[in-house]
Amino acid sequence: MIGRIAGVILHRAQDHVLIDVRGVGYIVHVSERTAANLPPAGQATALYTELLVREDLLQLFGFPTLLEKEWHRLLTSVQGVGAKVALAILGTLGPDGLSRALALGDWSALRKAPGVGPKLAQRVVMELKDKAPAVMALGGALTVDPGPLPEVELVEAAVPAPVPAKAAPSSAQATADALSALGNLGYAPSEAASAVAEAAAREPAAPTAALIRAALRLLAPKE
């Protein structure tokens, strides 16, 4: 199993990147969002990877964080969602947008992804709504970048310093902490996830304490 790729980018396209690792070129499929955040050709990068094995095909899929990789695994557990459709969903919504859509039951948000129709979007929400809080709770624990980058050989012209792929925003940690706090208060995972997602949608940059207060207001009994 290949869990991480670190090397020099030889070519970057919208949906894949060719990475040279000690003379061997690996084609790694990525979302458009990830591709846009990668450094240009000639610079070093590192990605977490998932290897898809079929009878006649081996494909590598790359992710800037372990959290995004975990969301990809969860998406592909749904019937009708292949690895590339899962990438399209992540590329369209990002990990934060996906977690919010699942927690709120907003299947229309998933329809924005290429290749996702209304029936598939509804199936994804129905099957993953109760599973999403577990991944959301992992939060910042899985948003670390893929680690040190290899040195880039200087050949004739100077090559800029290696630039890692951009990691997921720190809001993932605030979300995880808020979910943990609400769980300690006795709220069900799906109930807490829905409230935290709605609170985060209203104020994306909210720190943990503010997120908890906002979620508690949403969970308070309505008069």
From Swiss-Prot:
Subcellular compartments: Cytoplasm
Keywords carried by this UniProt record: Cytoplasm, DNA damage, DNA recombination, DNA repair, DNA-binding
Main location: cytoplasm
Region described as Domain III: 170-223
Region (Flexible linker) residue spans: 144-169
GO molecular function, one term: four-way junction DNA binding
InterPro entries reported in the protein's UniProt record: DNA_helicase_Holl-junc_RuvA_I, Hlx-hairpin-Hlx_DNA-bd_motif, NA-bd_OB-fold, RuvA, RuvA_2-like, RuvA_C, RuvA_C_sf
Function, as annotated: The RuvA-RuvB-RuvC complex processes Holliday junction (HJ) DNA during genetic recombination and DNA repair, while the RuvA-RuvB complex plays an important role in the rescue of blocked DNA replication forks via replication fork reversal (RFR). RuvA specifically binds to HJ cruciform DNA, conferring on it an open structure. The RuvB hexamer acts as an ATP-dependent pump, pulling dsDNA into and through the RuvAB complex. HJ branch migration allows RuvC to scan DNA until it finds its consensus sequence, where it cleaves and resolves the cruciform DNA.
Family: Belongs to the RuvA family.
Name this protein carries in UniProt: Holliday junction branch migration complex subunit RuvA
Organism of provenance: Paracoccus denitrificans (strain Pd 1222)
Gene giving rise to this polypeptide: ruvA
